[in-house]
Amino acid sequence: MSPGLLETNDYPTALRTFEWKALWELVDGTAERLNLAHECVDRHPPEAVALRIQKADGGREIHTFGALAAWSSRFAHWLEAQGVARGDRVAIMLDPSLAFYGALFGAVRRGAIAVPLFTLFGPDGLALRIDDCSPKILLVDREAERRQAEFPAVRVLAVDGSFEAALAEQPAEYAPATAADDLAVFQYTSGTTRALPEAVR
């Protein structure tokens, strides 16, 4: 019987006694039913701090796990209402914020694939990634009309006051139905050594 992963204090022991099946000790889910949004967000006390965000203008934001769980659950409900199915890609081109992390975990909660995109990508870099992942929805902070013209096959939405109001009408809890082998995130590499950056899945 190997020691629990959280009870091992040194690397040699952890390496010697490691078993893949022991990883299931660390999560609530099973191979048949596992959701990363639940594991990363819902398991924490709702009043505990989840996000500390330093803004470019010097401002700061602090958000709890409860707020993150509610935002992501409402977004998952909204995605379902918009016809976003399991395996569909949802591109998220937002500055660090509750909306960014809420959308990321909300897409995962729904069973869609979250695709975080850097807000300072130029036209060519963004087009390469959009063409590669073929998202059903692209969330942006601003310039939604221009992005829509650039990518007519993608539904482009600005996360603004009206969008937040629409989310507020959705329930604050969502029961995910995903498995351990479902894809959750496409994270594009920097692409410095190849024309098209590779999506780590």
Residue locations for each model-derived region?
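N-lobe entry segment of adenylate-forming
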Residues: 1-63, 67-80, 153, 177
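Structural core segment of the AMP-binding/adenylate-forming
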Residues: 3, 81, 105-168, 173-178
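Conserved S/T- and glycine-rich ATP-binding loop of Class I adenylate-forming
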Residues: 90, 107, 138, 183, ...
